[in-house]
């Protein structure tokens, strides 16, 4: 029989408590004796934000420095803005994107021999003041579609409305609060490849292999006007004109087709305003920017920029060696949501709504004091390119290398500072949106990653894969925040609602799933 050690005596317990107390008293003394450094805060455009200040290395956590910067800027609790910091290594052309647990060790590791007498430059990037929680459980599994779900998108107004397009030739609008179908949108005679809500949430557009575009009223489920006819082949993608640019009392819609053209439609009449022709291959993706430029990516390996008002070509970017699969704009999130933000306050008049949408766009797209959207293109050649369309030259800002297979999908974070890319190499990668530098790999899927979507606060990314799972990633750490099994087959489409409440997914198993915290 095993002999048990006797319990510690009162004296032993008292000595242990005293020893622990002594350690706790000494630890702060040791910690605060790390020395200090001088911090120079700059904004993302390189402008100095405050005077140089001295900070103790022991207190130099990202949270503490964020609080200090707010104090230096004279902000009260109402105006408080959380920041993340990029560290410029002195004497080297090196910027560390992820703030470390131990700043002193990081500087010494990179050869800064005397950090105590060195001024360290910290780029401060504002973070969202609201926080989105990682979705962690299945809210609803909603059957209804008779074939795989190919696309899904939440209404910009609320996560309680979701649209999906399917291989059963229908689109559907779902009530995600109750987990029930609201409307089945019938009319297409081919697969519905894309669904897209207008920025004000008052229309839903669908595009199909039947060569048509249709616009629906999501409140009644009825079609608005006749179907838009003009394309000769499948219609692959849609893009709404940004809300602040709507004119003549009508919205405009762009559609990209396998027939190598893009058409601009007047929504209230269904008339074609312009046909953008020039691509020599299928136009796989289209985006409508906040300065009335239209961006297209094609299987002819080019990315083109068009003037939406005149219908003329502005730039032709040719750098990719294979098909362009997807393109994204740094302003995508604010253009998709127009005047809807985390406050849920909707301006009363049309003029005020326009003004708010324009203000949100200009704030999101500003680089060095001027409005300049960035564009990123993803290709079958395993690469991505970052472009500045305001630059007249056709030279990219950066070439983003690292994927070992085709890059399927790409998205800017809502705050415009990061890029996430999903690839056939089973990985999702994060990149700096300013200079295109690689930041980290999000590895965990065991099959190609088809799509990715950001949370509205830019702190989380959700990915959908051929391996039948969704995964939620913490962007700061690069770690898996939540694994979401539940699909019975490949996950083709994923979206995160603009209000942060829900994630939706759909794929080969034909059922829509919504996920919540």
Curated annotation (Swiss-Prot):
Domain of life (superkingdom): Eukaryota
Pfam families: WD40
GO biological process terms held by the UniProt record: ribosomal large subunit assembly
Gene3D superfamilies reported for this sequence: YVTN repeat-like/Quinoprotein amine dehydrogenase
GO cellular component entries: nucleolus
Compartment annotation: Nucleus, Nucleolus
CDD domains membership: WD40
WD repeat start and end residues: 144-184, 187-226, 230-277, 278-316, 351-397, 402-441, 444-483, 486-517
Its biological purpose: Involved in ribosome biogenesis. Required for processing and efficient intra-nuclear transport of pre-60S ribosomal subunits. Interacts with the AAA-ATPase Midasin, which is essential for the ATP-dependent dissociation of a group of nonribosomal factors from the pre-60S particle.
PANTHER family referenced in this protein's UniProt entry, alphabetically: NOTCHLESS PROTEIN HOMOLOG 1 (PTHR19848:SF0), WD40 REPEAT PROTEIN (PTHR19848)
Assembly and interaction partners: Associates with the pre-60S ribosomal particle. Interacts (via WD repeats) with uL18. Interacts (via UBL domain) with MDN1 (via VWFA/MIDAS domain). Interacts (via WD repeats) with NSA2.
Protein's UniProt name: Ribosome assembly protein 4
């Amino acid at each position: 029989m095993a002999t048990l050690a006797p319990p510690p005596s009162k004296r032993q317990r008292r000595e242990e408590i005293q020893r622990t107390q002594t350690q706790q008293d000494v630890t702060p003394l040791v910690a605060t004796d790390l020395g200090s450094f001088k911090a120079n805060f700059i904004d993302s455009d390189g402008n100095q934000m405050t005077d140089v200040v001295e900070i103790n290395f022991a207190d130099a956590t990202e949270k503490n420095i964020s609080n200090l910067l707010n104090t230096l800027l004279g902000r009260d609790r109402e105006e408080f803005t959380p920041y993340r910091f990029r560290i410029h290594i002195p004497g080297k052309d090196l910027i560390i994107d992820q703030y470390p647990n131990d700043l002193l060790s990081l500087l010494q590791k990179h050869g800064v021999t005397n950090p105590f007498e060195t001024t360290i430059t910290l780029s401060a990037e504002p973070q969202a003041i609201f926080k989105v929680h990682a979705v962690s459980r299945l809210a609803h599994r909603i059957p209804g579609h008779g074939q795989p779900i190919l696309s899904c998108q939440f209404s910009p107004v609320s996560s309680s409305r979701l649209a999906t397009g399917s291989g059963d030739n229908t689109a559907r609008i779902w009530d995600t609060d109750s987990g029930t179908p609201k409307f089945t949108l019938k009319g297409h005679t081919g697969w519905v490849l894309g669904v897209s809500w207008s920025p004000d949430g008052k229309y839903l557009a669908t595009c199909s292999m039947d060569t048509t575009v249709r616009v629906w009223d999501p409140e009644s489920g009825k079609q608005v006007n006749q179907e838009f006819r003009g394309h000769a082949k499948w219609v692959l993608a849609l893009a709404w004109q940004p809300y602040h640019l709507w004119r003549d009392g009508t919205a405009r819609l762009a559609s990209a087709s396998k027939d190598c053209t893009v058409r601009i439609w007047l929504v209230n009449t269904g008339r074609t305003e312009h046909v953008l022709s020039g691509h020599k291959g299928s136009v796989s993706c289209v985006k409508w920017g906040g300065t009335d430029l239209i961006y297209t990516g094609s299987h002819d390996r080019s990315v083109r920029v068009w003037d939406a008002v005149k219908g003329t070509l502005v730039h032709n970017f040719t750098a990719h060696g294979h098909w362009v699969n997807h393109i994204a704009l740094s302003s995508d999130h604010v253009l998709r949501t127009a005047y809807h933000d985390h406050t849920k306050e909707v301006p009363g008049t049309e003029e005020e709504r326009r003004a708010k949408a324009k203000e949100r766009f200009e704030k999101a797209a500003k680089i060095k004091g001027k409005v300049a959207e960035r564009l990123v293109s993803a290709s079958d050649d395993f690469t991505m390119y970052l472009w500045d369309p305001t630059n007249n030259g056709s030279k990219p800002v950066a070439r983003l290398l690292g994927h070992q297979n085709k890059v399927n999908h790409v998205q800017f974070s809502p705050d415009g500072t990061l890029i996430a890319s999903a690839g056939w190499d089973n990985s999702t990668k994060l990149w700096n949106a300013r200079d295109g530098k690689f930041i980290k790999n999000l590895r965990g899927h065991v099959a190609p990653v088809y799509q990715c979507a950001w949370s509205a606060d830019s702190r989380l990314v959700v990915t959908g894969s051929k391996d039948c799972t969704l995964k939620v990633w913490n962007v700061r750490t690069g770690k898996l925040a939540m694994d979401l099994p539940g699909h019975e087959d490949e996950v083709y489409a994923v979206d995160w609602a603009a209000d942060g409440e829900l994630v939706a997914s759909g794929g080969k198993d034909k059922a829509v799933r919504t996920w919540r915290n």
